[in-house]
C-alpha cells in the first residue's frame, strides 16, 4: 500500500524560481515477516519525492519544465524500406538486419542499382564482398544462386574484390582501420562478429521474426511456380510449372527442405530464397517431441544431419543436445542470403516494406 501527500514542498512557481522539482512525498507501507516466529511488523516508510504532472502535462525538474517522450525501440528482426530518389527517378531500397546484441547488417541500393552493405555500421562495401566472405567466392557462384538479377550483376561489375580472402581482408580493414590485416585474423573477426553466441544474440523474438519474414513458404504462397517442384526424397510432385502454389503446398515445399523456388511474376522469372528452416513436427510427425517444446522452425541442414546419423531410439535425446544448433541464437549464412534475396524481391514489387 502507498500514498502521496497532498501538500507539495514548493508550489509550481516556487519550484521554477528555486530550480527545484515540483513533487510530493511518497510513503509506502512495508511489512516484515519473521518466518521462524510468525511475527509480523508493519511500518510506514518515506520512500522519496515523486514528481507531479502539471495541468499542462509537463513536469518541473530542477526548475526546468520537461515532457516525457516515449522512446520506441525496435525488437530484433529484419526491416525493409524504400523511397523515391528524385535525382535518378528510381526507387532505392534499404534494410536493417538487427540482433538484440551484436553487429548490424545494413543494406542499401543507389540510383545506379548498386547494392551495398554496411557491416557493423562501418563504411559501405558492395554486397558481393559480403557474399564472397560467407562462401560464394566467384562471380559465377553468385550468379548461379541469385539467378538473373540486374542489381547483382551491376554490383559484381562494381566490386573490385574477387576472392573470399580478399573479401575478409576488406571487411577487416573497415572494422579495424589502421591495423595490419592477416587472413586468419580477418576470418576470426568475421566469424566472431556474426556466428559466435557470446557476441551475437537474436533472442527468441529475433529468431521468430527472422523465420517469419525470411522463410520460404510465406513468400511463395499464392504465387505461380515457374518450374515443376519435386520432393527430392520421395519424387512427389508438389506443383507443376504454371500452377499456383497454395498455402498448404508452400508449407509442404519448405518442410521438404527445398529452399529455392522460381516464380512467375509480371511476365518474368523471379527467384525466392528462403532461410533454410523447417517445421520439425512436420518433418518428424511420428516422433514424440512434446517434451522439447519446439515453437520455432529449425535449421533444416542440422536436422537432416541428425536424422541421417542417429538411431531412431536416440533421436529425441540427440535433438535435445543439439537444440542450439537447430534454433541458433546467431544469424546464419542462410539468413544472410535470404535477407539479401528479400531486398531483391522487394525491388521487383514482391514483399512489403516495413516503413
Describe each region flagged by the PLM.
Residues 1-355:
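N-terminal non-catalytic structural scaffold regions of very large proteins
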Amino acid at each position: 500500500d502507498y500514498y502521496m501527500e497532498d501538500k507539495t514542498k514548493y508550489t509550481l512557481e516556487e519550484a521554477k524560481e528555486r530550480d527545484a522539482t515540483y513533487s510530493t512525498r511518497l510513503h509506502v507501507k512495508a511489512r516484515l515477516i519473521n518466518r521462524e516466529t510468525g511475527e509480523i511488523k508493519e511500518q510506514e516508510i518515506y520512500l522519496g519525492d515523486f514528481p507531479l504532472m502539471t495541468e499542462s502535462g509537463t513536469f518541473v525538474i530542477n526548475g526546468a519544465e520537461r515532457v516525457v517522450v516515449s522512446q520506441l525501440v525496435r525488437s530484433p528482426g529484419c526491416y525493409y524500406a524504400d523511397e523515391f530518389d528524385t535525382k535518378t527517378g528510381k526507387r532505392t531500397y534499404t534494410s536493417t538486419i538487427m540482433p538484440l546484441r551484436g553487429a548490424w547488417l545494413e543494406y542499401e541500393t543507389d540510383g545506379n542499382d548498386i547494392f551495398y552493405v554496411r557491416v557493423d555500421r562501418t563504411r559501405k562495401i558492395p554486397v558481393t564482398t559480403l557474399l564472397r566472405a560467407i562462401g560464394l567466392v566467384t562471380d559465377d557462384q553468385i550468379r548461379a544462386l541469385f539467378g538473373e538479377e540486374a542489381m547483382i550483376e551491376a554490383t559484381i561489375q562494381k566490386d573490385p574484390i574477387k576472392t573470399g580472402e580478399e573479401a575478409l581482408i576488406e571487411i577487416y580493414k573497415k572494422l579495424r582501420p589502421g591495423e595490419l590485416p592477416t587472413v586468419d585474423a580477418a576470418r576470426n573477426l568475421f566469424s566472431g562478429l556474426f556466428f559466435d553466441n557470446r557476441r551475437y544474440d537474436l533472442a527468441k523474438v529475433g529468431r521468430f521474426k527472422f523465420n517469419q519474414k525470411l522463410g520460404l513458404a510465406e513468400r511463395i504462397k499464392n504465387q505461380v511456380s515457374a518450374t515443376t517442384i519435386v520432393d527430392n526424397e520421395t519424387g512427389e510432385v508438389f506443383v507443376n510449372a504454371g500452377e499456383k502454389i497454395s498455402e498448404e503446398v508452400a508449407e509442404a515445399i519448405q518442410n521438404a527442405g527445398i529452399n529455392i523456388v522460381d516464380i512467375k511474376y509480371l511476365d518474368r522469372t523471379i527467384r525466392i530464397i528462403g532461410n533454410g528452416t523447417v517445421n520439425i513436427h512436420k518433418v518428424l510427425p511420428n516422433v514424440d517431441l512434446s517434451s522439447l517444446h519446439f515453437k520455432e522452425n529449425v535449421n533444416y541442414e542440422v536436422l537432416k544431419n541428425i536424422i541421417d546419423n542417429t538411431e531412431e531410439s536416440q533421436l529425441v535425446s540427440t535433438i535435445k543436445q543439439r537444440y542450439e544448433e537447430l534454433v541458433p541464437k546467431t544469424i546464419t549464412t542462410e539468413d544472410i542470403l535470404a535477407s539479401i534475396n528479400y531486398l531483391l524481391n522487394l525491388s521487383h514489387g514482391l514483399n512489403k516494406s516495413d516503413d
